[in-house]
Amino acid sequence: MNLRTQIATLALAIGWSLVLAHAEEQVFFAFDDHNIAWQHNLKLTLVPATKHPDNPVLRRGPKGSPDHGHAVLYGTVIKEGSKFRMWYLGMHETEILKGQAPGWWRPMCYAESMDGIHWIKPDLGLVEFNGGKNNNICLIEGELHSMTRVNDFLSILHEPGDPDPSRRYKAAYIAHMPYEDIKGGMSRIGVKEKRVGVTICATSADGLRWKVSGDRPANAGGERFEVSGLYRFGDFYYTTGQLISPWSWRPDGSTAGRVMLAYRSPDFKTWSQAKAFAYARPGQLVEPPVTGQQMHMGAGLWNRGNVMVGLHGMWQDADAKPPKGESWNYGVRVDLGLLISNDGIHYREPVPGFKIIPRGPEGAWDDIAILQGHAFVNEGDQTMIWYSHWDTGSKLKSMEIGLATLRRDGFGYLSRKEDDNDAHFITSTFTASEISLNVDGITADAPLTVQLLNHLDQPMEGYSAQITQDGVHRSIAFSKPLPAGKKIALRVHFPVNSAARLFAIYLNP
């Protein structure tokens, strides 16, 4: 490598590190009781999402297509420029045999949209299927065939600033590999299966043509793992997912149903064998545990810079054993609940049991179980969330993809609890050049008053203002610029007659 190349490579690496270190917009959500811990006379109200009237917005394909059996968003939606991009799991057969997709393969399929509602499945021309390449299957190449066969949840991470163009898209997915294919083997914890669920990582320059990373699964040498998440938070990449006893257990060593665990890597190459206990539903940790309550497949996650927000599967066992001849999980029901994490490792549910996206009423297309994806986009004044339906009876009924929407970042809001008293909160400290609020319900005779505080909660002279109008991004106009580089906090006051609802605070660096 000549000196010019070395300098260019170093510059790219430095630029990449600066991109990673650069603080983007921070969000203090109304349901974040770490960043909005100090409250007086306030209550939190969560808001269920509204399902699109034309659901499902992405349907399975015709006979002979790779998604004729199902099209499920065990996958990812991102927006690049003006285009929405979706990676989802297809299945070409219309029948599940022995509890698995044919050949332990559900192809990584791809779709595009200009509005997030109307989707096309482009002919990528990359993978031979049913006698031709006119399909929307993404290409995955690797040394071992069994490592290229996606069979469950695929998570896509887009990092356009990566200095290596071939790594600007990253993926983690579940493959079911024969033990003899796994270099390094697996741990002796748990029960040995015919095939083992492993974490496969891959990289791509365009999100369509993928190369498997390395010659072994990321969890080689460890336990089976159903990976269902991939993100970068701080200095590490994280994969999150699901595990169950005997491969995992509650913190005291006792038997656990499905719980969420996390692994990490500093470079997307070497992954920890040690893992963190990321989340379990409250009923799973009491003694005795709540019967039938589990969390399903980790969480569909959204990295907002300073916090992770997500939706997790609220699994409830069937009331009775399945009738003879039915699937083992016949009667299982799943809704989607809200999660948040301030460290990218440990997650909590702001209001345990609240359903942000509930399954539909009996007879609706999504009436059995709801599946989450990494599929959140803020578009204008709304938040768009895509999800899919799971037929736990294994008949593949309506296993397609739907859309739900909220007010922009409108998962929940703070408002006064008692009508005849004022209210306020104080945030954690931060640095910012601009502050704005996501708020509604403000009236001319009841504006919100905002006051900057120093790190000792003392008011700062010249930094008081009133919010007199609603808006999803209502800027606070102080009489002078915010103090550069100083740790400050924000006090927001609701007068006695206020009907205001505050959804979020935005802090621009």
Language-model features and meaning:
Residues 22-509:
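Carbohydrate-active catalytic/glycan-binding domains of CAZyme proteins
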Residues 8-17:
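Bacterial N-terminal signal peptides
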Residues 1-4:
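N-terminal secretory signal peptides that target proteins for export/translocation
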